[in-house]
Amino acid sequence: GGRISGARIRYRGGHTREYAKKSYEIQLESGLVLHWNAESDDPSMIRNALSFHFMEQIGVPSPRTRPVWLSVSGRPDGIYLEIEAVNSRFFSMRGIRYRSLLYAANDSANFELKDPESRRRKRSLADGYEFIEGDGDTLVRLSDFIGGLHRLKDSRLQEAIEERLDLDLYFKWLAGAVLTGNYDGFEQNYALYEDDASGRYGILPWDYEGSWGRNCFGKPCSADLVRIQGYNGLTRRVFQFPEWRRRYAEELERIMETEFTEERIGPVAGGMLERIASAVKLDPARAATLKAFGGEKAFILAYIGKRRRFVRAELKRWLGNEVSLPRRQLAGGSSD
């Protein structure tokens, strides 16, 4: 006797909408919104789940996930990853009071003045964002912030960023995106909210299927694909200031010492894979990636080792003599 509840269902996803196995957004009568992702391009099916777990561990509030088996009109549709939506309920459950919420829906959400495709000035500096919640001035405030990033200089720029950006959260989020290799996550696929008390912007992860050594189509990619600074106009302006470069470098090192290690990730990834292994074998839509599934834990751990070595080498090259991080850290940790 399962529970029966009314719900509204719609397709979700970008290129995956064309796949035979669809992904869905579920809105229950209670107001709970869930995403059921087919994860068709990820042979492990755990990259989103592992990324959100990792982000949570390093201090970035992230969606909760769980695997589910879906049947449609009595017909088995296979295994899905259920992902909590980033919405009012998400913030309420975490005690975060917020003023507005936007989704970075495409790569125009890059904190730049020009459109990434046409290279012409954007019609609105808020292009690329999907308005979710807020007031009539939400997009105006965002446009003013982005405009200030490119108009202000030196101490005035630094003051404006400090006033409007939660730098601690930003550095954690940036480090997480960089270490997991989420190439698409710097200019889109994130949630941007304004904290109600401070008025500062916070940034949260949204879609991390392309990570841990594979791109968003599931193809292997090099561990040095994503540079340690990430990619967007906000980060570029933040890193004009040496003290903020140092803070970010120290955050990267802290995470590589504590959370981004084979010893920490291995048991989590292994547990996730073991939990879904029997269901993956029963899902006909996953037949093409079944062979790869068995090697995904080793693949992910190999990526972590390579990524750690690359990031540490790049930190030395990027910072030079500007900062003096501990010699042991810059030389590489024991798990490398």
Where are these regions (language model features)?
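Middle-to-C-terminal accessory/interaction subdomains
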Residues: 150-154, 159-168, 178-180, 200-205, ...
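A conserved hydrophobic secondary-structure block that centers on an alpha-helix together
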Residues: 37-76, 151-156
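ATP-dependent phospho-/nucleotidyl transfer catalytic cores
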Residues: 88-179, 255
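Conserved protein kinase catalytic/activation segment
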Residues: 189-204
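Second-shell loop/turn segments in exported
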Residues: 36-42, 128-133, 160-161, 234-235
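Gly/Thr-rich phosphate-binding loop signature of adenosyl cofactor/nucleotide-binding cores
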Residues: 83
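Conserved NTP-binding catalytic cores of kinases and kinase-like/nucleotidyltransferase enzymes
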Residues: 1-50, 56
